[in-house]
Regions:
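Histidine/acidic-residue-rich, glycine-tolerant segments that coordinate divalent metal ions
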Residues: 1-103, 190
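Metal-dependent amide/peptide-bond hydrolase catalytic core
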Residues: 63-258
C-alpha cells in the first residue's frame, strides 16, 4: 500500500487491535514502543551421518544443533539489556528418523523479537555468529536463512507521544475518562509499524472482553469469539480520532493544499 502511494499526503495514522484483556467499552493506550520488531530464522547444520554404534566415524549435527540452541538462550540472559525487552524462541527442530542412525543434517528455527528495531538487528547478527561458531566447534557447517523473502522483517511499533495525547482526549470524550486505561507492551509484531516509518502513528487496544458472551479467548485461539458491541465503538472512535485531528490541524492542511 505504501509503495502504491496509499498514504498520499496523510499527516498521521491511527490503528486499533482488539484486546481480550480489556473490557468491552474500554481502550488501553501505550506511548512509545508498544509492539516488537520481529523476524523469523531457520538454520541448517550439516555434519556427516553414520551408524549410531560408531559416532567417532561421524560428525554429529544433533550435538552441534543442541549446543547452538542452548548458546542462543545466553544472548537474552547475558547480552540483552533487561530494560530493553527481547525474545529468542526456537520453535522447531528436525533431523533424522531412525533409532540407530546419526543424521547428516539437522534443521531448526524460530523467531526473534525486540522492542527496538536496532535491538533486533543486533540480535540477528549475534544469532548468526553463535550458530556458525557452535557448528565450527563441532566440525559442522551452518547455513542460516532469515526468511526475509517469505516473512519480511517487521520494525517495532512506536506510538507517537503527541498522538497519544490526542487519542487519550478523544477516548475520554467518547467513552469517559474512566474507560481509557494504561495499556501493556506486547512482544507480538504488527505491520502497522511500516506506516509509522513514514508518518506519526498510534495503535491502541480496544477491549472486547465480555465473560457473559464468552468473549475471553485471545484472537489466535480456536475458541475466539467477538463481542460485536465493539464494532460500533471502534467505528465511532476511528471517526472521532480522524475528525478531531483534522479540525485541530486544518490550518496546516489548508496551507499545504494551497
Amino acid at each position: 500500500m505504501i509503495k502504491e502511494g496509499a498514504l498520499g499526503d496523510a499527516e498521521a495514522i491511527f490503528g486499533m487491535h482488539i484486546d481480550t484483556g480489556t473490557l468491552t467499552g474500554r481502550i488501553a493506550l501505550v506511548s512509545g514502543p508498544v509492539l516488537a520488531s520481529t523476524c523469523f530464522f531457520e538454520a541448517k547444520i550439516e555434519g556427516v551421518g553414520g551408524h549410531a554404534a560408531g559416532p567417532h566415524s561421524t560428525v554429529d549435527p544433533i550435538l552441534a544443533a543442541s549446543f547452538s540452541i542452548l548458546a542462543l538462550q545466553q544472548l537474552i540472559s547475558r547480552e540483552a539489556d533487561p530494560l530493553h525487552s527481547q525474545v529468542l524462541s526456537v520453535t522447531f527442530i528436525r533431523g533424522g528418523s531412525a533409532f540407530n542412525v546419526i543424521p547428516s543434517y539437522v534443521e531448526f528455527g524460530g523467531t526473534l523479537r525486540s522492542l527496538t528495531t536496532e535491538g533486533l538487528h543486533k540480535l540477528q547478527q549475534r544469532l548468526k555468529e553463535v550458530i556458525k561458531g557452535q557448528a565450527a566447534v563441532h566440525r559442522c557447517k551452518a547455513f542460516i536463512d532469515m526468511k526475509e523473502k517469505d516473512h519480511p522483517f517487521y520494525p517495532a511499533v512506536v506510538n507517537d507521544d503527541g498522538l497519544h495525547q490526542h487519542v487519550q482526549k478523544v477516548g475520554s470524550l467518547l467513552l469517559g475518562p474512566e474507560n481509557v486505561k494504561r495499556g501493556k507492551k506486547v512482544m507480538a509484531g504488527e505491520d502497522f509499524a511500516f506506516y509509522q516509518e513514514k508518518i506519526p502513528g498510534f495503535m491502541l487496544s480496544i477491549g472486547i472482553r465480555n465473560e457473559e458472551l464468552g468473549s475471553i479467548h485471545p484472537p489466535h485461539s480456536p475458541y475466539f469469539f467477538l463481542d460485536e458491541d465493539v464494532l460500533a465503538i471502534g467505528a465511532a472512535l476511528h471517526t472521532a480520532l480522524a475528525e478531531l485531528y483534522l479540525n485541530e490541524h486544518k490550518h496546516s492542511i489548508l496551507d499545504e493544499a494551497f
